[in-house]
Regions:
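Acyl-donor-binding surface of acyltransferase catalytic domains
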Residues: 2-27, 133-236, 399-405
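A generic N-terminal leader/anchor concept
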Residues: 2-10, 15-122
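A short beta-loop-alpha structural element at the N-terminal edge
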Residues: 35-47, 232-247
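A conserved beta-strand-loop-helix scaffold within acyl/acetyltransferase catalytic domains
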Residues: 52-94, 102-112, 235-340
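Acyl-donor binding region in acyl/amide transferases
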Residues: 111-194, 199, 313-390
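Active-site proximal loops enriched in glycine and acidic residues that flank catalytic Cys/His/Asp
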Residues: 290-291, 300-306, 338-344, 355, ...
Length: 407
């Protein structure tokens, strides 16, 4: 979709003193007017993808994306999510220099299923410059309004499987894969433009107990007795994981229907997801519960922290980046949970403990000392209770913002 005109925002010299002072930011080109243009060619897409590296060049905890993945993500012929949505990529300019970016998304199927008229923004990046931020947000709001939307929320991309929300607590902690890393000023920029809380997501950090507490082992033993005929599959080879990829993600589709922002995987997206992550995951951190017919009833997937490896390679896999990333995952003392689900008919029967003990055993064997829960919805009290039983504490909080659109 196309923005019909390039928006131009006034020079600070045309503002009163208080307004001019409000747009003072950290970028040296403050004072120039802002123009907004749509990404239409490969050069502009390159600028869109690589702008965050300039903004975050002195940001110690920021982890670049894996650029090979990023190029495929923004390629409509490779990323099937584009087929279900209206999208737009915008760049902000001061003079000829790119100073900001944002993506707009309208997910028609999600809106229909949830009876909503909400547009989304994602991949919002600027220096600390309210003038640029307002120009980008205004452009997305106008675009969404033009498509009949009544509200804009974000950061939220195609689904909850993509990085979502802005960090509002835990700025001193390192970023993990598939999560956003932002400066505090980005939160201020949104709030000053009228955005407020839509939804919070929390992340727990758990100290991995060694040895595993006796009470947890007793619960595991009881669960095994009560679930005769079920077994926890463990893996040492990615090749042996592959036959379970589609069954695992089909289970996710069935169990995540009420999760905020979740969009079911299509068959093609299942393959894309596997290609994107499987080579990075130590198969020892994949646990799957099956019944006697080898049907998947539950699963959990973890990954060694790879942030330092990606930082070292600057987001490049080749020629040697992949080795640094895999070494980082092995050497890291932190295990990051990625996904997990239990068939609704088997909830409350101890399958979580059966998998959990096996995961803790693998984590201890691999030298892990802490566990990151990944993002959990603040109202998901059941999962949060389980994390807290293990001594977990919230150490990061992310917020998805929203704003009503006026006619």
């Amino acid at each position: 979709m196309v923005v019909k005109s390039i928006l131009k925002y006034p020079d600070e010299s045309t503002m009163d003193d208080s307004a001019a002072q409000a747009v003072q930011g950290d970028h040296p080109m403050n004072g120039l007017p802002v123009t907004i243009g749509e990404v239409k060619d490969s050069k502009q897409l390159y600028q869109f993808i690589h702008l965050p590296a300039a903004i975050h060049k002195d940001h110690f905890n920021w982890v670049p994306p894996i650029y090979m993945d990023e190029k495929e993500f923004f390629n409509p012929s490779k990323n099937k999510c584009f087929q279900a949505c209206d999208t737009i990529l915008l760049l902000a300019y001061k003079g000829k220099e790119v100073v900001g970016r944002i993506m707009g998304i309208i997910h028609h199927q999600y809106n229909t299923d949830h009876k909503e008229k909400k547009g989304r923004f994602a991949f919002f990046e600027t220096w600390n410059d309210p003038q640029v931020a307002k120009a980008l947000l205004d452009a997305i709001e106008d675009w969404a309004r033009g498509h009949g939307m009544e509200r804009v929320i974000g950061p939220l991309a195609f689904s909850d499987k993509d990085p979502q929300g802005l960090l509002i607590e835990g700025f001193d902690e390192p970023a993990v894969i598939a999560s956003n890393c932002n400066f505090p000023y980005q939160v201020d920029l949104l709030e000053k433009d009228g955005y407020s809380k839509e939804m919070d997501l929390v992340v727990y950090q758990i100290k991995i107990p060694n040895p595993i507490p006796e009470f947890y082992l007793k619960i595991q033993e009881r669960a095994i007795r009560l679930n005769a005929g079920l077994q926890v599959l463990e893996f040492t080879s990615r090749r042996k994981v592959k036959p379970y990829i589609h069954p695992v993600l089909h289970l996710l589709n069935r169990t995540f229907t009420e999760i905020f922002g979740f969009v079911p995987f299509s068959e093609a997206e299942m393959d894309d997801f596997a290609n994107r992550y499987l080579f990075l995951i130590n198969p020892r951190f994949i646990k799957i519960v099956v019944n006697g017919q080898n049907e998947v009833l539950a699963f959990v997937i973890g990954m060694g922290h790879i942030g330092e490896g990606i930082q070292k390679t600057k987001g490049k896999l080749f020629p040697f980046g992949i080795f640094h990333i895999l070494r980082s995952a092995k050497k890291s003392k932190q295990l990051n949970l990625l996904l997990g689900a239990i068939d609704p008919d088997y909830r409350g029967k101890g399958l979580d403990v059966m998998m959990g003990v096996k995961m803790l055993e693998s984590a201890i064997a691999q030298g892990k000392m802490t566990l990151d829960s990944h993002l959990e919805l603040e109202y998901n009290t059941k999962v949060r209770s389980e994390m807290e039983k293990l001594g977990g504490e919230v150490y990061k909080r992310f917020r998805i913002f929203g704003k009503n659109l006026k006619e």
